[in-house]
Structure formats: structure tokens, C-alpha cells
Amino acid sequence: RVYHADDICVGQAFIEMYRRFDDKRMLQPVMERAYYVASHPSKAPLQKTDAVGTTERWSWSDALFMAPPVYAALYTITGDKIFLNYMDSEYIECVDSLYDKEEHLFYRDNKRIPLREKNGSKQFWGRGNGWVFAGLPLIVDNLPLNCSSRSYYIRLFTEMAEAVRKTQCKDGDWRTSLLDPDSVSYTHLRAHETRG
């Protein structure tokens, strides 16, 4: 799965090892893979389905935590804009596809957009939004202060922070579906929200 965001995520660990030990050999495999993906972007549609190849793109919310911090860090480490340009392009396309501009939350994937909860609310998966929210600081922290796209990620984080705050229930927890307070409590989300 060369393109799958989950399989690029492991690069975050290699990048941290490189930063700690200053050994470029630790970066080589992740850099080669990320460079290949960025220089040969998938032509698959940005629609997650059960069909083969639909996870080659960042077509589900979790992917925005998995791969972008790797590309941001590789851009900063190498100075090669191919990493930044690829990250920005894929990220923005995913946001344009899955981010609800009214609620400032993400649908898990395009199949969820028309779905509604029992209370009639839009279906925003708590864990997926937690992944996105926790990933944004990793992207921002990995970009140089003068990077032109940094403000895009900061703005998105700020919008989401307010939306996430509003969805927190009286018991201090979030729900599996963020706009349905009667859905199951989701303690897993606490870690993501705290990290963000």
C-alpha cells in the first residue's frame, strides 16, 4: 500500500529518531517513499469506497493525521517543496470534500455526507474529527514560521477548536457522533482533543 496514509504515518517515528540522533539513514526509507508518492500522485478519485485504490488518496478524515505531518517535516528537513506542495494539494482537496463549512467539522468520508443521526443532525464521527484536530498542530509545528501555507492550517485549527469545544457534553466527554448527545460516549476522543 504505497499511497495509503496509514502506512506513511510510521514515518513520524523515523523523523523523530532522525531528529534525536541526527542520522540521515533513519530518514531514507520514509523520504524515498514520500518522494515517490509526491512525484507520482495517485489518479484515484477522492472518494473512499470499498473498491480497490480508493484509499490511495486522503479520502477519509483519519488520513489527515496520518500522512501530512510526515510531509510537513520532510519539507522542513530537506527544503524540497515537492513535499509541501503535495501535502497542501491533497490536504486542501480533502478539506474541500469533507469539511462542513457551517459546522466546522469533518465527515469521516464522502459516504457519510448525506447521512443523518436519529436526532436529525449531520453525522460527524468523533474519532475522525479527533484525528484531524490532533494532526493540525503536528503540521503547524513541522512547518517553518515563514511558510506561506502555515496560516491555512492555523485557521482550520482555530475553526475546529471552537466547534469541538461546543460539542463537548456536560459530562466532559464527547460522543461518537459529535452533534448527537444521545450517541455513545467516546473516551477515546479525549486524548485527541487534549493533544490538539
Regions found by a protein language model. Give the residues of each.
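Loop-centered beta-sheet repeat module
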Residues: 84-137
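Acidic/His metal-coordination segments adjacent to aromatic residues that form catalytic metal sites
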Residues: 47-53, 109-122, 176-183
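Conserved small/polar residues in nucleotide/adenosyl-binding loops
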Residues: 187-196
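Blade-loop segments of beta-propeller domains
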Residues: 1-17
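Long, well-ordered core segments of solenoidal/helical folds
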Residues: 1, 28-48, 81-107, 154-172
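Oxyanion-binding "anion nests"
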Residues: 133-178
